[in-house]
Amino acid sequence: NGTEFERMGNASDLFAAFTYIVPGMPMIYTGQMSGNHHRLEFFEKDVIDRVENAPQKALYKGLNDLRAANRALWSNEKGAPMIRITADNDNVFACVRQKSCPKHGDNTVIAIMNMSAEPQTVTLDLTNLAGEYNCLCGKKMNVESTQTFELTPWKYIILTK
């Protein structure tokens, strides 16, 4: 029970992104895109505190746009299976989802997530995944066959092509 901020604190954005990366259908509950910090009454009419420029609005828009545009993240047989990437750090979750489509080309999503409240360093074996990617943050990133990432607490990197 409680809001996502009460339950997850600073990890709420990471776990929102996680639900978009793993197979299945991500759920957005009433008030999440507004950054609602108010517990809604159960089975009662309640008011949502809407924050116009809530950071969650941009977060969920970016995640929704990514999921719509990249076929690897689609649900069921239309999407791609999730494959864990071998990491040398148990606090970091890393995976790839790849989907080839003759009509729409190759779709690849790499996710690297620090699942802890401490800074983490991880080296990943990205053999066969090397190349230039778009980062969800809006920048381009070159991925090497073996690459080390420095991640602040609850930080995630989502790379696509």
What do the predicted segments below correspond to?
Residues A16:
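Conserved glycine-rich, hydrophobic/aromatic-active-site segments
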Residues M8-G9, D13, P23-I28, Q32-K161:
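Carbohydrate-interacting/catalytic domains
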Residues N1-E6:
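Active-site clefts of carbohydrate-active enzymes
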